[in-house]
């Protein structure tokens, strides 16, 4: 069995978000008011080459996140609380191919959650079985999903039926 950590770009967030200053709405307010940014942090995905098949834990971010208009301008977090840098060659599908893992060979995707820095690479794996908690799926795809920071309009068309 082999385990690979794959960096699919970098992200900077407000220092108070990373430190978890406050609780509930106070924590959110602290994040928005913070003027300090973290150094760039790695956005990671994981591949586990297992005897029963390849398992991917999270799919990292997509290079489309670096394009103007990818994030909703109306959302204050995406406008003021997040900076991402992702090059096309950093996308998870291309990196796994360089390791000799074809996306079509990936048996399972284990999604810790469905924010874009963890689910941005879903489009590379249309044939994989997706494992995600029902609560997380409902939060991400429900009426309030976009307000909660999920880019459910960016999920692949096949995703709703596969999860």
What is each model feature region?
Residues 60-62, 115, 136:
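Catalytic metal-binding/acid-base residues of hydrolase active sites
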Residues 123-126:
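Short, conserved loop/helix-junction motifs that constitute active-site signature segments
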Residues 57, 112, 132-133:
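Active-site flanking residues adjacent to catalytic metal/cofactor-binding acidic residues
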Residues 8-93:
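Conserved beta-strand hairpin/beta-sheet module of binuclear metal-dependent hydrolase folds
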Residues 82-117, 134-163:
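Metallo-beta-lactamase
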Residues 1-4:
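Extreme N-terminal starter segment of soluble prokaryotic enzymes
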């Amino acid at each position: 069995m082999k385990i690979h950590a794959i960096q699919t770009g970098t992200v900077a967030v407000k220092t108070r978000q990373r430190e978890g200053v406050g609780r509930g709405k106070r924590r959110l307010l602290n994040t928005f008011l913070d003027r300090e940014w973290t150094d760039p942090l790695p956005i990671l995905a994981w591949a586990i080459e297992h005897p029963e098949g390849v398992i991917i834990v999270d799919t990292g971010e997509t290079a489309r996140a670096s394009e103007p208009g990818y994030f909703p301008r109306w959302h204050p977090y995406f406008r003021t609380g997040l900076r991402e840098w992702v090059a096309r060659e950093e996308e998870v599908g291309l990196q796994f191919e360089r390791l000799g893992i074809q996306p079509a060979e990936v048996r399972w995707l284990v999604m810790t959650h469905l924010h874009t820095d963890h689910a941005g690479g879903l489009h590379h794996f249309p044939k994989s079985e997706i494992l995600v908690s029902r609560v997380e799926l409902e939060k991400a795809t429900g009426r309030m999903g976009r307000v909660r920071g999920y880019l459910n309009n960016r999920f692949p068309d096949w995703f709703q039926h596969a999860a």
